[in-house]
């Protein structure tokens, strides 16, 4: 306790007084007994006794942690690939795709770097850098590789859901939103007439619709993956036997069957995307040769 503008320590108890002084002010030092309880989290300077009888002690705490916590709120910079940990795209970004690249001359926007670069060729020879300029940089689209949360309320991938978890990247989020929250314009042209939101899902379903996958033990399955799991689980005496001419029951599959079907259809979506990228790389070289020969690019494509 303090007595007559002097301080003393009673036993092992520490006395701490919050400072009201301005930051950076230098206080004269006083003789102070060493506390028997060292502080690992904070430091306290010597208390100052002024002529008015008021004792002031400056409290100096450690700096805050260097790790920045992203709340995903109003901090827009928290959504960049350099600082952010996840991304919550808006509904328009999910349906249309985020615009990543802009022409520096006319401000026309593109969602692919190579399309923007080829568009700029039409603005003059100073922008013509050859086919290699179409490849762009990896950092320009790094935000598309961030884990994404769904913006739909009530979705298990929404950040406010009690058991929420992010999706792998932006493309996975787009497919998820179409499947779970979007319209289903694709209808099976066979007897079941089941509807789908993703074209790849629809194609895969029609390819296998009406088929049963049989095991030699007599069990039948609607999905080839289920048959493989059955054979792997029971081992000897079980093997695949396919019958493709038999029509199975009509109606919606149960939830487990739908999840198995979606896992198979993810592979189809990735194959379609890879084929599209390969065709695009070939077309870029053809378009560049066409531009060098005729000096123009169709505005319909760009």
From Swiss-Prot:
Compositional bias annotation for Polar residues: 26-38
Principal location: nucleus
GO MF annotation: an example: zinc ion binding
Keyword Transcription annotated: yes
Chain ranges of zinc fingers (C2H2-type): 101-123, 149-181, 186-209, 213-238
Recorded phenotype for the gene knockout or disruption: Defects in venation pattern in leaves and cotyledons, altered phyllotaxy of vegetative leaves, short roots, delay in leaf initiation and reduced apical dominance.
Motif interval(s): Nuclear localization signal: 178-181, 222-225
Subcellular location: Nucleus
Composition skew (Acidic residues), residue ranges: 252-274
Gene Ontology cellular component terms for the protein in this record: nucleus
InterPro entries recorded: C2CH-3rd_BIRD-IDD, WIP1/2/3/4/5/6, Znf_C2H2_sf, Znf_C2H2_type
Any GO BP: leaf vascular tissue pattern formation
Superkingdom in the source lineage: Eukaryota
SUPFAM superfamilies: beta-beta-alpha zinc fingers
Region spans: Disordered: 1-78, 245-281
Coiled coil regions, renumbered to chain: none
Keyword flag Protein biosynthesis: no
Described function: Probable transcriptional regulator. Involved in leaf vasculature patterning.
PANTHER family: ZINC FINGER PROTEIN WIP2 (PTHR45878), ZINC FINGER PROTEIN WIP6 (PTHR45878:SF45)
Sequence similarity: Belongs to the WIP C2H2-type zinc-finger protein family.
Protein name: Zinc finger protein WIP6
Native organism: Arabidopsis thaliana (Mouse-ear cress)
């Amino acid at each position: 306790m303090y007595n007559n503008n002097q301080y003393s320590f009673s036993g092992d108890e520490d006395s701490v007084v919050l400072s009201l002084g301005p930051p950076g002010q230098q206080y004269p030092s006083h003789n102070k007994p060493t506390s028997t309880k060292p502080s690992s989290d904070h430091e306290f300077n010597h208390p100052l006794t002024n002529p008015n009888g008021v004792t002031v002690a400056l409290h100096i705490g450690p700096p805050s942690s260097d790790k920045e916590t992203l709340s995903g709120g109003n901090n827009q910079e928290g959504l960049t690939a350099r600082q952010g940990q996840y991304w919550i795209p808006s509904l328009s970004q999910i349906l249309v795709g985020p615009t990543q690249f802009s022409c520096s001359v006319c401000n026309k926007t593109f969602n692919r770097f190579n399309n923007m670069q080829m568009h700029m060729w039409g603005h003059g020879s100073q922008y013509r850098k050859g086919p290699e300029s179409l490849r762009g940089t990896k950092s320009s689209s790094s935000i598309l590789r961030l884990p994404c949360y769904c913006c739909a309320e009530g979705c298990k991938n929404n950040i406010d859901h009690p058991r929420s978890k992010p999706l792998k990247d932006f493309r996975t989020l787009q497919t998820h939103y179409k499947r779970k929250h979007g319209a289903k314009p694709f209808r099976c042209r066979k007897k079941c007439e089941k509807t789908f939101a993703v074209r790849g899902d629809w194609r895969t379903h029609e390819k296998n619709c009406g088929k049963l996958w049989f095991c030699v033990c007599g069990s039948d399955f609607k999905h080839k993956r289920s048959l493989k799991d059955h054979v792997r689980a029971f081992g000897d005496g079980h093997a695949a036997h396919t019958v493709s001419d038999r029509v199975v029951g009509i109606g919606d599959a149960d939830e487990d069957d739908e999840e198995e079907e979606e896992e198979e259809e993810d592979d189809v979506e990735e194959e379609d995307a890879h084929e599209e990228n390969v065709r695009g790389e070939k077309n870029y070289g053809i378009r560049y040769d066409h531009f060098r020969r005729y000096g123009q690019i169709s505005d319909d494509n760009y």
